[in-house]
Amino acid sequence: MKKVEAIVKPFKLEEVKEALSAVGIQGLTVTEVKGFGRQKGHKELYRGAEYMVEFLPKVKLEVVVQDERLEQVVEAITRAAATGRIGDGKIFVLPVDEAVRIRTGETGEIALG
């Protein structure tokens, strides 16, 4: 099993969610996060004063999938989240040793569905 973590632009969340649904992903975790990379920050005006906003709002999606579905999920996220501009985000893939469905006690890949 693999955990896929994707950091994407907030306005792309719905597109990514629909793309994942189209490849059979039934659930995911979404967290509002802030960060910076090559995109750096930007300046904003507030009450006549200029402020540097260094951390930009992003959305972090997390989903655990069977190994054989990994490529399909990564491709779906990549297609849906891409704008072609700096700041589109990143995808990280991590190994998952175990999954447990708390309600039933089911473990392994059975607990994912």
PLM feature spans:
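Positively charged, small/polar-rich N-terminal and surface patches that mediate targeting and assembly
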Residues: 1-113
